[in-house]
Amino acid sequence: MTDVMRDVASLRMLQGMWRRAGETVGLVPTMGALHDGHMALARAAREECGKVIATIFVNPTQFGPTEDLDAYPNTFDSDLHMLREVGVDVVFAPTRDVMYPAGFGTTVKVAGLTAPLCGAARPGHFDGVTQVVAKLLNLGQADRAYFGQKDWQQLAVVRQMVRDLNFPTEIVGIPTVRAEDGLALSSRNAYLTEAEREIAPILYRTIRDAAARVAAGHGATGVCEAAARGLLGKGFTRIDYLECRDATTLAPAETPDPGTARIFVAAQLGGARLIDNVSVG
C-alpha cells in the first residue's frame, strides 16, 4: 500500500525507520500529470532501490509570470493509482506552504549550464528547479534520484548542483519515452488539439534528421537553421531554440565527434511548448 504524506515530520520519521533497517532509498520528483515517461522513472527506482518515494509538487518558482502555472494539469487521483501500480512506497505531496513557508528566502543558482537553451528562453526557470530539487533531495534523503533525459539540460544542471554541494545522492538519467509516432511524452502534450497532435511528431523527426546530417559532416549552424525554418513552415508558431550543443558542457558544437553532442529544440505548437533532444552520432 502506498502512503501519501504531506508534512515533513512524517516523512522524516519514516526515513529514520528505513535508514535503521539499512534500506536503499530512491526518489522520483514529479509535478504530477503523470504518463509512461514518469512511470519509467518509478519502475527504475523500484528495481534498484529497497524503498521508493515519489513526489508530486507543482513548483511555482520555476514558472515565469506569463507561463502555465495555473493551467498545469492536476490529475492527483490517477497519478496516485499509477504510482501504486508500480509499487512506490510513499507519495510526498506537500502544499506550497510546506515547501515555501512564510519567511523562506534561500535560492540555489547553478552558473554556466543554466545560461543557454531553456535558461535563455525562460529566465529564472532553473533557479526554481534547483531550489525545489535541493529541497526534495534534502527531504527525501535518497541514495538515488531519477530524472528523464527529455529534460537533458535540467538533468545536467541537477548533476552539477549535486556535485558542487556534495549531496550524497546519485542522479540517474532515464531515456526519453516516446509515443509510437516518436513524440516525446510530456504532461504538456495534453494542451495539444487533435490537429496539433498530428503535427507534433514532426518535431522529433526534424531533430533526428538534423542530427544525422551533422553526424555526416554538415555544419551544425546551417543544419539547425534550416530545420527551424522547416518547423515554422509546418505549423509550429515559435522556435525558442534549435541548436547543436556539447552533451556535457552545453557549449555550441559545430562539427562534433560522434556521441559527444546533441540537437536540442524547444518549439511552440498551439498552447504547448514542446522540448526534445537527440544524440548526434
Curated annotation (Swiss-Prot):
Record's subcellular location: Cytoplasm
Coiled-coil region list: none
GO molecular function, one term: pantoate-beta-alanine ligase activity
Reaction equation(s) it catalyzes: (R)-pantoate + beta-alanine + ATP = (R)-pantothenate + AMP + diphosphate + H(+)
List of residues binding beta-alanine: 62
Enzyme class at the top of the EC tree: ligase
Biological processes per GO annotation: pantothenate biosynthetic process
Gene3D superfamilies, A to Z: HUPs (3.40.50.620), Pantoate-beta-alanine ligase, C-terminal domain (3.30.1300.10)
Pathway listed: Cofactor biosynthesis; (R)-pantothenate biosynthesis; (R)-pantothenate from (R)-pantoate and beta-alanine: step 1/1
Protein residues bound to (R)-pantoate: 62, 154
Positions of ATP binding: 31-38, 148-151, 177, 185-188
CC annotations in GO: cytosol
EC assignment: 6.3.2.1
Pfam families tied to this protein: Pantoate_ligase (PF02569)
UniProt keyword annotations, A-Z: ATP-binding, Cytoplasm, Ligase, Nucleotide-binding, Pantothenate biosynthesis
Residues of the active site: 38 (proton donor)
Similarity annotation: Belongs to the pantothenate synthetase family.
Role: Catalyzes the condensation of pantoate with beta-alanine in an ATP-dependent reaction via a pantoyl-adenylate intermediate.
Note: The reaction proceeds by a bi uni uni bi ping pong mechanism.
PANTHER family from the UniProt entry: CYTIDYLATE KINASE/PANTOATE-BETA-ALANINE LIGASE, PANTOATE--BETA-ALANINE LIGASE
Quaternary structure annotation from Swiss-Prot or TrEMBL: Homodimer.
Name the UniProt record assigns to this protein: Pantothenate synthetase
Species of provenance: Dinoroseobacter shibae (strain DSM 16493 / NCIMB 14021 / DFL 12)
